[in-house]
């Protein structure tokens, strides 16, 4: 068979590296061998690198990646034919065939193998030199009979690196989307930013467990520039992992092939799953030697960056526990500067808003003052124009105003007469403990006991006897000169009228003409609250007073209906309601109680001021004074 047929057709023991376009043959070693200790020793030996007139020399172990310690074969490995101190080297002859350069340690009968395979395995030499390639496993002497019969001839092929590049990067075999440099850069920068953010937040170092799918060219340049540091890390991790890289000679320095990390990793994963060795290629600028890469163990994840001495490029196969340097705080200097600027701006904005609010408040205050001044000016001008025809009467008006002021002062003094010491002692004596049924005052067919007087002490609620007695004293005072005539109904009157109607209270006014008086006082009890309704015949009005600001127009309508029925029953005529008005005083118009116990006192004092035709000018602060004063008035049956 000719040379072409040798390069194309292969026996069961031949393996063709399609990516390289070269055919390698392996031969079965003889049956005889050496002990297992020698095998282990020969596998662990460092394989020296020879340089001479040949283009390159390679060494290779004879154990397949699928080798396991529990695997037993009848045919021992060819390593058994080597002594413990022997080193196998292979050179390239002038005709392109591989020859054995290792001197024979002894002669032994040889037998061809029944099945032949190409065994590739990753090794790392202890000397840290480049990885080497082994072609055959039975070269224990200069030339064997089998080798003479079946010489190994490499198949003609184009440039090694070019064929590898075309075979691995060919779009026909693997169709994948290639990311642009900009996209890869953006992805890597986003990932780096997120990693640094996690490091700042947690205070821990975060490392990338494996390289990204698309490795940026910028990072590759950084790795090639730091080849010395990578070599040191390779030497330190020599006992944990081993990887070999096959490179190719290039016809020119510009024809170097580049493999991405994604293709290498995917190809390695496929080779591990199928049990075949993984071959990766890369070109070196200054070193034309070839390197073969194969996984060390399927269950181990080695990571090594291999490069030849004097090389300017590096090929990253895997990364194992890569130590990412601590991120520099300068990366976030721009963000910190933005935050600082924003905080300064926010403080200035708050200060500016505060000043604006102050100016608005000041402007509003000045505007109100200006409006008040304008109102006063308008009122003064109107009053001036009205007084011009009455200029001669101005002194008389001034004199009248002076008298009114003096009269108001005397009224205010009479409104709150002072309680003397004797009065104070008498009041305290009544509040002392004693017989609760003791009668302290009796008038108007009413009896006031000590128990009733105790309702005026502190914040107690007033009862019906106290309110009815006080209303009768108001009626008695109205008989005096200068006071309007008053009739006060009993505290049970309105409740009876509302629930039972007019017929239930018809006989209550048998001896009284309600239409002959000026004012009718109607105390209204709402269960837990006292109010007052006032019927003023002089003003034709019915007004409702509530110290809690309540509105009760219904009570006013009930009283108006009562007047109609009372007029028909007593006078035998219809009551004229023309001009009558119903009111409910608002909380802004009358004093309001500030607790939950003075409602009875407020109702009584409303009636006191109304029956004197005086304005209601007391407040919640006057209630303690009014309680003491009412005690004295009830005891003496006389209003102050």
Swiss-Prot record:
It is found in: Nucleus; Cytoplasm. Residues 446-609, 446-610 are annotated as: Protease. GO terms for cellular component: focal adhesion; glutamatergic synapse; nuclear membrane; nucleoplasm; postsynaptic cytosol; presynaptic cytosol. A motif (Nuclear localization signal) lies at residues 171-177, 570-573, 624-630. It holds the Pfam family Peptidase_C48. Residues 1-200 are annotated as: Interaction with CCAR2. Keywords: Cytoplasm, Developmental protein, Hydrolase, Nucleus, Phosphoprotein, Protease, Thiol protease, Ubl conjugation pathway. SUPFAM superfamilies: Cysteine proteinases (SSF54001). InterPro entries: Papain-like_cys_pep_sf (IPR038765), Peptidase_C48_C (IPR003653). Its EC number is 3.4.22.-. The modification Phosphoserine is found at residues 57, 117, 157. Its main location: nucleus. GO terms for biological process: negative regulation of proteasomal ubiquitin-dependent protein catabolic process; positive regulation of transcription by RNA polymerase II; proteasome-mediated ubiquitin-dependent protein catabolic process; protein desumoylation; protein sumoylation; regulation of definitive erythrocyte differentiation; regulation of mRNA stability; regulation of postsynapse assembly. A motif (Nuclear export signal) lies at residues 631-640. Residues 38-47 have a biased composition (Low complexity). GO terms for molecular function: deSUMOylase activity; SUMO-specific endopeptidase activity. Disulfide bonds: none annotated. The active site is at residues 529, 546, 599. The keyword Membrane does not apply. Residues 19-122, 267-309 are annotated as: Disordered. Protease that catalyzes two essential functions in the SUMO pathway. The first is the hydrolysis of an alpha-linked peptide bond at the C-terminal end of the small ubiquitin-like modifier (SUMO) propeptides, SUMO1, SUMO2 and SUMO3 leading to the mature form of the proteins. The second is the deconjugation of SUMO1, SUMO2 and SUMO3 from targeted proteins, by cleaving an epsilon-linked peptide bond between the C-terminal glycine of the mature SUMO and the lysine epsilon-amino group of the target protein. Deconjugates SUMO1 from HIPK2. Interacts with RBM33; promoting ALKBH5 desumoylation and subsequent activation. This is Sentrin-specific protease 1. It comes from Mus musculus (Mouse).
